[in-house]
Amino acid sequence: MAPKAKGMPAVPRAPIFRLMLKRSLLALPAIAGAALLATRLVPGSLPDGSTLLPSGWRIRPAGRVVPVGTLPLNLVTLSDGSVIVTNDGYGQNSLMRIDPVRARVVWRVPLPAAWLGLARTGRDWRDTVWASGGPTNRVYRFAWQGGAAWLRDSMALADSGAKVYPAGLALLPRQGLVAVVGNLSDSVYFIDTATLERRGAVAVGHRPYTTVTDGSSLYVSDWGDSTVSVIDLSVSPPVRRSALFVGPHPSALVLHGSELLVALAGANGVARVDLATGHVREQLSVSLAPNAPPGSDPNALALSPDGHTLYVAMAGSNAVAVVRLGAKAMRVAGLIPAGWYPTALAASADGRTLYVANGKGNGSGANADGTYIGNVIAGSVSIIPVPDSAGLRRYTSQVYALSPFSNARLRPTIRPSERPPELKHVVYIIRENRTYDQVLGDVARGNGDARLAIFDNGVTPNAHAIARRWVLFDNFYVNGEVSADGHEWTDRGLASDYNEKTWPQIYSNRRAWDLTSGEDLANPGGAYLWDAALRHGLWVVNFGEMTESDEGDSAAARPVRTNIPGLKDITVTNYPGFVLSVADTTRARLFGDSVASWDLQGRFPDLTILWLPRDHTLGRQASRPTPRAMVADNDLALGLIVERLSESPAWPSLAAFVLEDDAQNGPDHVDAHRSVLLVASPYARRDAVDSTFYTTASVLRTIEEILGLAPLSQYDAAATPLWSAFMWRPDSTTFSHLPSTWPLTELNPSAFRSRIPVSDLAEADEADEMELNREIWESVHPGSAPPPVRQSWVIGERRTAR
């Protein structure tokens, strides 16, 4: 058994910046039509020099910052002191050289594709750089001299259609080989560095990530198996000798003498493995508070040249932990503020400079011009002089001041006596991909842009009626970028390291979808809202969320499947998953049948989860419903559901929360993450506007507090719950749906040729989302306005993996 994880040392906490005034229910005036907060904070630069992220967290990265494009995952230093970085996310991938003195990119080589995996060898100012090609199944070799690089050659590990996906690399000079991890083939491949011929392969654990070597053995982090595979290089061919259990989601590896240091992205910690015994000698927690729930996401490591200090990238905390490696124990000496979601680290040869790749850079921003969210978020590299003890103390205080999470946030935000006493039933309704401006931008009393409201009151009268009757939330942001991570954020307040690092490749058509397959890496067992509710002894029913169905004309032809263990016994089997040929009004009828049955039984589930996916739309598929017809159907279904809930005997003790899983399919003049949030409940305030900064995690936190559940992650723990939008005395007046004012049978022209294959619309977000956005815009503004444009700091279109 591994030793007990050690906590953070006592570090004085600076006062945490409060995003909004904390108000109790009793202190809030119930004034109809009044905005609940006079000030509105939105994502972006703040007066103190920090940046407010759409997640509600703040960053102020140390050092100088260099923009490098989407999702940088690799950093290496060259013998001349410059830094090589790859951007490996959505859109064009590239290999770049950064001059650390001038703090700028001075050379860039476009790549067909890239992902994790970068290594270099060389001396006397001559370097060879090896880069994994991800979906190309190739490894690229670059010659680098005098600041210029050129592609010397490349090696194919397998045919282009094979599932290999080269990832982490390790150079084996004794053997004259380079070892390449095959992330999708669960193997390690060996390439002869002289001939570029393949010299065999060794099977390892599930979804291997990266690898390091001490010359006689090769160590491979098995991302999906909680193990490190040990390959013996002293024999020919090499063989896998053992698999060392280290903990959940092992990612980055660093050798330190006779020890192996492993970043455990799923455990908030770092494991220290004694290679002589094969046992975990120590596990150190690097979270910002002891006993913190998941969320720190340590996913990258770098060792100082003297071997005394380990740097740990904490992607979820937007910081780097500075860990002193003592002979007997590790300890966190302090923290350095990074950008948004740090993903790679490197130390200079003299140990004076730390380089940090920030996967999401310095935030997002508005996309009123329709720029796709995959391009809105661009990564960066921070160039940070290594601080002395006093500087590290200042940085540590800064990290704590920037973070909204603390141990105190694990407790309920208000006392049970301060929240509505009878509120005990929650209905959680999840829809697809709309921004605030697309739907509610036409509401005059909110912060909207009516020019972007293509699904305005004429298309969505029920959403408008709900926002008008209860609360208009005009400052709500989704935590996720796309459906791949959006449903994870919606259902558990966090997206895994695996999810965050693979969805940009999936959405660039460079990797097959596997994020709802029950894969523990993407869908960690026991981590979801329904799991927590079931453990608490609550009654939970799921309608469609995280399920799959086939197209068909009847329920029997659409068997509902789920690979998520916790959903198998609580999912309604005749409720379709993502089948857009099924009207959401049909889903509303099926749900209404269940409500009628519960009413007859005199009981109602504690937690009901409902997926209404049809506002995703089918774009301009010929002879299929138009985007506005599908959104109108979705809106009518929502109105019918809220009406039926309001007629139930459970209504006086019920709250329904309605949100989008992400906001990727439209523009917004405030931020690409701003989206639609609706609340229907007798306890919701009437005719109000709430401009409090809320997130997906805020909704989760509110649900948890209603149901008596602990926070699932650091993000929902830190989030501001929606209590400002609730009142003490209920108004149980029923809600009557509004009939659709848009023809639900409106079809796209039969002659139109969509650029999206029909098969790509059979699963959520399988389609080219940029193209879908373009078609949705053109369906509403045919020839009268320019469609949203693709923008990025690099020129590039989506590429199909070959």
Predicted feature residues:
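Intrinsically disordered, low-complexity polyampholyte segments enriched for Lys and acidic residues
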Residues: 4-6, 22
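Predominantly soluble domains enriched in secretory-pathway, periplasmic, or organellar proteins
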Residues: 23, 29, 33-414, 419
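N-terminal pro-sequences and low-complexity stem/linker regions of secreted or lumenal proteins
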Residues: 394-802
